[in-house]
Curated annotation (Swiss-Prot):
Major place of residence: cytoplasm
Family: Belongs to the YqgF nuclease family.
Described function: Could be a nuclease involved in processing of the 5'-end of pre-16S rRNA.
GO cellular component terms given for this protein: cytosol
Species of origin: Chlorobium luteolum (strain DSM 273 / BCRC 81028 / 2530) (Pelodictyon luteolum)
Catalytic class of the enzyme: hydrolase
GO biological process, one term: rRNA 5'-end processing
This protein's name: Putative pre-16S rRNA nuclease
Amino acid sequence: MKPKGRIVGIDYGTKRIGLAMTDPLQLFASPVGTFEPGGLHHELRRIMQGDTVDLAVVGSPVCDDGSGNAMTAVVDRFVEELRAAFPDLRVERVDESHSSREASRILAASGKSRKVRREKGRLDSAAACVLLTRFLEENRG
């Protein structure tokens, strides 16, 4: 049986991008950090040099009625750029509905002070963790 590679989760934003990654067995997700849009490709290349990455899941904004919004088109362009930059990497979109809200609740429940929770990027990487965890739970087999 071929060993699994890691999966990266990406919470894309125009100002910051949250990144999370699974363990090698794809059992759980951990935050990697937050990056400016221009620095994400460099970070992904760095990760892929040290680890086998099988898949990237990108949070895609979906309205409650299932339709997209203005940010959906931005994420679609990002996904195409990601596929062009990493042609061997499988990329899938996942519904990111309420991932930031859920991440905010998780950070609050963790006992972190409000000041720490408000640090730039902490919420973004936690949201990437949430969407990656959802993906893992939905695809356990």
